[in-house]
């Protein structure tokens, strides 16, 4: 078993502080295959994958002064998709359970994770491992030369890279005062309900358009969201700035294998 327990990092504390039933801080990543999912083989793939990612085989607890993760021998099991997407994972009725779930529907495998555990990139790598190990059981001959996405050691995956690379510096002078940003308006859903919209885009075409404009995919999608917000703004409020929060994957800038949270945001 990996390290028995460790404190959550500073970024994870934000998700713990803002976790509610309206916004349970759960994200989903899915993979759709070309054939129906075999639940027994998917469960076998999860049993193979879990030891490869010990940093995700944890439960979350509230200590006297801080939250902490504790390693567990629980093994993940898949279930048919029977809840709304991104249903809460860190709630009293799920105490002492893994803070991620794997479900399936037709030919699709869904991975949902509590955001204090990792970010989208860490979840994506975890799902790739699950899918790779599942396909190795379904099509062993075709998959025998396909390596697992996780090539780092358990120690490298668990190290807190914030401690290694962050250097505290004091700001010189006061931060500039920013004007109040525009706030979206609309009818609120009941407290414990979420609403989802599903869209399908060609990654190749969207990337080509972003590169044509000389920007990254994240910048292009962020700008598209801002334009959509602007189109809904009342004319009298269009002088207000539109502010959105974009995550930054620091793995692109630092040599780390850390799979917990490395996503400060920019406005």
Residues covered by each model-derived region:
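Extended hydrophobic secondary-structure segments that form protein cores and membrane-embedded regions
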Residues: 242-249
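Conserved helix-loop functional segments at active or binding sites
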Residues: 252
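Flexible, P/S/T/G-rich "lid" or insertion loops adjacent to the active sites of thioester-utilizing
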Residues: 162-215
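Secreted, luminal/periplasmic, and some membrane-associated catalytic domains
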Residues: 240-242, 261
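Non-catalytic N-terminal regions of enzymes
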Residues: 1-158, 207-211, 216-240, 256
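Single conserved hydrophobic/aromatic residue that forms the stacking wall/gate
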Residues: 260-267
